[in-house]
Amino acid sequence: TCSIPYEYSNGKLKRTLYYSNGVYANSFTENN
């Protein structure tokens, strides 16, 4: 199961996907 924590980076909402073991699966910035 992957968790999707949300963090603010430079005033933009950054979503990073983590594996259950805590390894980075994919990192990108939300751009709506």
From Swiss-Prot:
Disulfide bonds: none
Tissue: Expressed by the venom gland.
Source organism superkingdom: Eukaryota
Record's GO cellular component terms: extracellular region
Alphabetically ordered keywords of this record: Secreted, Toxin
Location in or out of the cell: Secreted
Gene Ontology molecular function: any one: toxin activity
Protein name listed in UniProt: Hainantoxin F8-35.23
Organism: Cyriopagopus hainanus
Lineage: Eukaryota, Metazoa, Ecdysozoa, Arthropoda, Chelicerata
